[in-house]
């Protein structure tokens, strides 16, 4: 097809040549801008007036006004009043076709009137330029004419503000990074998967300096930014790797062909819609309505409002509210999640479908190469990059909470896989520049970071990786419901956010969580009366077993450094069903698994997570708490974070620095363990901790601090040996890499 085959109304008419347009643009920019704005406003008003008058015409007048409306359409296109289709050229189409410049690499041969460039001998020294400067928003179409399987990699393309004529005899081997390290050159590598024979690459630079590219008329997004558009720009292409020949296409012809194909497809779809509905299967007619009702039960009622008002849909409401309603609607049953996945083309959960699964949204803080879905449930890395795929959980994780990561898409061309990490850093405080390309460098940050790379070897689409943090700090991972493997240890007393690095072969994923068995919420500063609590406990003994504990000594935070006493009591009852209560503002979540061995306090507003191993219960427990009162003083233990947690044979006392409250687990009627053994083991542990002996040699006192984790568990000599390679140079408690050893002195 040539330019003569394109209708005249497709071309934009111009009365000046290219040089006159550029000269006029540079010297009379402001005048033309104001003149065009006024002309566009006048034309728009005239068009609207004629369209309104057409509605009042008779049928004969309408037939005679077709020519006028045809003229109006031309005016609309001329002044930009018609919305362009994605395939239409966004820039001027009255420019001559692009050709290759005579200045090029040593291994380049130009033919076909300067439109075809081939690379001979080797894989480098193949830099080419356009023969003329390109305009802003001018679409450049490149066809991959020849492909070789003897090389790897894809072409490099971009722009330069340097005249190629000034580079004759001074071209380097490669465009990236030889040219891009010089001022005035911008280029990026195209992914090798797009470099296939007869594929057509298009790209252009806009006024903001962003380079948008696409393949086969399908836009992929921005690949380059920061182009200086104040001067002339030439396109630069390095025919590198598996591509050995490229051809410049006339953008006008290519875009016209794409428009014709789209029009034909639209006509075919319109003809199919006009077929009698009796010929369509009944299931096919009912399927869209069933899907609409199943996935968005509120959407149908909003669209079917009387008076036609339901036709206008608030897109922002659908964009933000409907995904949340949908997740709430589907969170209760696994069948609802499977139905939703099948409707959206996502692989259903196969290995962890049992139980109550809740989709987990990702935090808005992410790596620069990650795209989140509108509901933030799906994270996808851009196809042209393999790193900077960080995503964080929107809230801190809870101890014992099972998180399930499902792989939605993979790309086997990349090496490496998904990485998992935990951090005490709030993602809201991070900037995109704070995240490195290699997740190992996160360990150099001042916050607490732990990372494990390649947690799933060679992941496939549909694989499910489940992980959770145990009360002892072990992080266990299982793939496809297989045996769990401990991959790292963390400081479980910290408030931790989980993060993933969508790296290497992993392209897209989403996350679910299984709700903990029992959740109790209580206000941060409750008003509790001892007499009222005792009366309430006596009244509730017939329904559930309960008990109260008196006051115990507690230490304030290390910053205050003084002893406080409190006589506040909190009565916690346990029934056979799941415990749940409504909390007000500033509430905290208490997680109590059904076995009653672990108690976890999760502050919603931030702070330290307190995890307590509950003591065994005895059937001869005193409900009045007299035994607890006698043993409370000897059972108190001060934690390193400044929070007091006491445990004894009769119960557990918990005190926080903010509210100074006591949380007590409920006694069970039967127990297979002996409370005396718990008391003895606790006393032994306290005596061991008080001696502060090195955990390696058990001879010298602890006199060193490990940097960066901050643990004090070894003497200085053992810490130096551990740091220099014995044990892998890791902290024996949290397995963090030891960066330095700091010696401490006591007086």
UniProtKB/Swiss-Prot annotation:
<dbReference type="GO" id="GO:0008104">
    <property type="term" value="P:protein localization"/>
</dbReference>
<keyword id="KW-0863">Zinc-finger</keyword>
<dbReference type="GO" id="GO:0005634">
    <property type="term" value="C:nucleus"/>
</dbReference>
<protein>
    <recommendedName>
        <fullName>Protein neuralized</fullName>
    </recommendedName>
</protein>
<comment type="function">
    <text>Involved in neurogenesis. Interacts with other neurogenic proteins in the specification of the neuroblast versus epidermoblast cell fate.</text>
</comment>
<dbReference type="GO" id="GO:0008270">
    <property type="term" value="F:zinc ion binding"/>
</dbReference>
<dbReference type="GO" id="GO:0045807">
    <property type="term" value="P:positive regulation of endocytosis"/>
</dbReference>
<dbReference type="GO" id="GO:0048749">
    <property type="term" value="P:compound eye development"/>
</dbReference>
<dbReference type="GO" id="GO:0061630">
    <property type="term" value="F:ubiquitin protein ligase activity"/>
</dbReference>
<dbReference type="InterPro" id="IPR001841">
    <property type="entry name" value="Znf_RING"/>
</dbReference>
<dbReference type="GO" id="GO:0007476">
    <property type="term" value="P:imaginal disc-derived wing morphogenesis"/>
</dbReference>
<keyword id="KW-0221">Differentiation</keyword>
<dbReference type="GO" id="GO:0000209">
    <property type="term" value="P:protein polyubiquitination"/>
</dbReference>
<dbReference type="Pfam" id="PF07177">
    <property type="entry name" value="Neuralized"/>
</dbReference>
<feature type="domain" description="NHR 2">
    <location>
        <begin position="359"/>
        <end position="514"/>
    </location>
</feature>
<keyword id="KW-0524">Neurogenesis</keyword>
<dbReference type="InterPro" id="IPR037962">
    <property type="entry name" value="Neuralized"/>
</dbReference>
<dbReference type="InterPro" id="IPR013083">
    <property type="entry name" value="Znf_RING/FYVE/PHD"/>
</dbReference>
<dbReference type="GO" id="GO:0030718">
    <property type="term" value="P:germ-line stem cell population maintenance"/>
</dbReference>
<dbReference type="GO" id="GO:0003677">
    <property type="term" value="F:DNA binding"/>
</dbReference>
<feature type="region of interest" description="Disordered">
    <location>
        <begin position="280"/>
        <end position="309"/>
    </location>
</feature>
<keyword id="KW-0862">Zinc</keyword>
<dbReference type="GO" id="GO:1901981">
    <property type="term" value="F:phosphatidylinositol phosphate binding"/>
</dbReference>
<dbReference type="InterPro" id="IPR006573">
    <property type="entry name" value="NHR_dom"/>
</dbReference>
<dbReference type="GO" id="GO:0007498">
    <property type="term" value="P:mesoderm development"/>
</dbReference>
<feature type="zinc finger region" description="RING-type">
    <location>
        <begin position="694"/>
        <end position="735"/>
    </location>
</feature>
<dbReference type="GO" id="GO:0008356">
    <property type="term" value="P:asymmetric cell division"/>
</dbReference>
<dbReference type="GO" id="GO:0004842">
    <property type="term" value="F:ubiquitin-protein transferase activity"/>
</dbReference>
<feature type="compositionally biased region" description="Low complexity">
    <location>
        <begin position="280"/>
        <end position="292"/>
    </location>
</feature>
<dbReference type="GO" id="GO:0005886">
    <property type="term" value="C:plasma membrane"/>
</dbReference>
<dbReference type="GO" id="GO:0007399">
    <property type="term" value="P:nervous system development"/>
</dbReference>
<dbReference type="GO" id="GO:0035204">
    <property type="term" value="P:negative regulation of lamellocyte differentiation"/>
</dbReference>
<dbReference type="GO" id="GO:0016360">
    <property type="term" value="P:sensory organ precursor cell fate determination"/>
</dbReference>
<dbReference type="GO" id="GO:0048471">
    <property type="term" value="C:perinuclear region of cytoplasm"/>
</dbReference>
<keyword id="KW-0479">Metal-binding</keyword>
<dbReference type="GO" id="GO:0005768">
    <property type="term" value="C:endosome"/>
</dbReference>
<keyword id="KW-0217">Developmental protein</keyword>
<dbReference type="Pfam" id="PF13920">
    <property type="entry name" value="zf-C3HC4_3"/>
</dbReference>
<keyword id="KW-0238">DNA-binding</keyword>
<feature type="domain" description="NHR 1">
    <location>
        <begin position="97"/>
        <end position="251"/>
    </location>
</feature>
<keyword id="KW-0677">Repeat</keyword>
<dbReference type="GO" id="GO:0007616">
    <property type="term" value="P:long-term memory"/>
</dbReference>
């Amino acid at each position: 097809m040539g330019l003569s085959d394109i209708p005249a109304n497709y071309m934009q008419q111009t009365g000046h040549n290219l040089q006159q347009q550029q000269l006029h643009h540079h010297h009379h920019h402001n005048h033309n801008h104001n003149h065009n704005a006024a002309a566009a406003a006048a034309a728009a008003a005239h068009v609207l007036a004629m369209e309104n008058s057409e509605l009042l015409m008779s049928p004969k007048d309408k037939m005679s006004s077709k020519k006028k409306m045809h003229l109006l359409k031309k005016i609309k296109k001329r002044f930009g009043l018609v919305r362009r289709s994605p395939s239409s050229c966004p820039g001027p189409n009255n420019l001559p076709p692009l050709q290759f410049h005579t200045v090029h690499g040593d291994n380049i041969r130009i033919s076909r009137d300067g439109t075809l460039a081939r690379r001979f001998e080797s894989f480098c020294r193949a830099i080419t330029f356009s023969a003329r400067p390109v305009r802003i928003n001018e679409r450049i179409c490149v066809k991959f004419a020849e492909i070789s399987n003897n090389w790897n990699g894809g072409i490099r393309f971009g722009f330069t503000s340097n005249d190629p004529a000034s580079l004759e005899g001074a071209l380097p081997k490669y465009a990236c990074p030889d040219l891009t390290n010089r001022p005035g050159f911008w280029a990026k590598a195209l992914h090798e998967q797009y470099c296939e024979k007869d594929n057509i690459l298009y790209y252009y630079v806009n006024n903001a300096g962003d380079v948008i590219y696409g393949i086969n008329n399908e836009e992929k997004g921005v690949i380059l930014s920061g182009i200086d558009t104040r001067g002339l720009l030439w396109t630069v292409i390095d025919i590198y790797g598996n591509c050995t020949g490229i051809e410049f296409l006339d953008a006008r012809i290519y875009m016209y062909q794409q428009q014709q194909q789209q029009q034909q497809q639209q006509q075919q779809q319109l003809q199919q819609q006009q077929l009698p509905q009796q010929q369509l299967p009944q299931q096919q007619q009912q399927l869209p309505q069933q899907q609409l009702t199943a996935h968005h039960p509120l959407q149908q009622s909003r669209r079917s409002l009387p008076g036609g008002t339901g036709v206008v849909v608030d897109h922002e409401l659908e964009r933000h509210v409907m995904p949340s309603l949908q997740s709430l609607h589907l969170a209760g049953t696994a069948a609802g999640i499977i139905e939703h996945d099948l409707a959206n083309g996502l692989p259903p959960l196969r290995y962890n479908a049992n139980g109550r699964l809740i989709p987990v949204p990702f935090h808005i803080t992410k790596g620069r190469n990650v795209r989140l879905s509108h509901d933030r449930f799906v994270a996808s890395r851009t196809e042209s990059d393999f790193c900077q795929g960080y995503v964080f959980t929107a809230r801190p994780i809870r101890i014992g909470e099972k998180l399930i990561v499902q792989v939605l898409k993979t790309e086997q061309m990349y090496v490496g896989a998904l990485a998992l990490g935990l951090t005490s850093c709030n993602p809201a405080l991070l900037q995109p520049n704070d995240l490195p390309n290699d997740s190992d460098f996160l360990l150099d940050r001042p916050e607490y970071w732990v990372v494990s790379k390649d947690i799933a070897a060679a992941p496939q689409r549909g694989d499910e990786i489940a992980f959770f943090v145990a009360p002892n700090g072990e992080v266990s991972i299982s793939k496809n419901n297989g045996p769990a493997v401990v991959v790292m240890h963390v400081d479980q007393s910290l408030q931790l956010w989980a993060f993933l690095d969508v790296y290497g072969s992993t392209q897209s994923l989403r996350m679910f969580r299984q709700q903990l068995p029992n959740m109790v919420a209580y206000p941060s500063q409750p008003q509790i009366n001892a007499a009222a609590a005792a009366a309430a406990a006596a009244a509730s003994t017939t329904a559930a077993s309960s008990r109260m504990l008196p006051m115990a000594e507690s230490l304030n935070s290390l910053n205050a450094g003084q002893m406080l006493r409190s006589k506040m009591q909190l009565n916690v009852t346990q029934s056979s069903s799941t415990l749940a209560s409504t909390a007000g503002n500033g509430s905290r979540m208490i997680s109590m698994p059904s076995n009653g061995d672990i108690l976890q306090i999760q502050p919603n507003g931030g702070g330290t997570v307190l995890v307590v191993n509950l003591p065994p219960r005895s059937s001869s427990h005193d409900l009045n708490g007299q035994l607890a009162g006698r043993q409370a003083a000897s059972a108190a233990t001060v934690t390193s974070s400044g929070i007091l947690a006491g445990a004894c044979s009769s119960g557990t006392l918990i005190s926080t620095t903010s509210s100074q409250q006591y949380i007590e687990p409920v006694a069970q009627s039967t127990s297979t363990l002996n409370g005396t053994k718990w008391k003895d083991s606790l006393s032994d542990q306290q005596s061991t901790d008080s001696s502060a002996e090195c955990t390696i040699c058990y001879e010298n006192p602890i006199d060193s601090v490990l940097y960066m984790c901050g643990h004090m568990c070894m003497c200085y000599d053992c810490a130096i040996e551990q740091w220099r390679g014995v044990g892998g140079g890791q902290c024996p408690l949290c397995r963090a890499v030891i960066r330095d050893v700091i010696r401490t002195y006591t007086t």
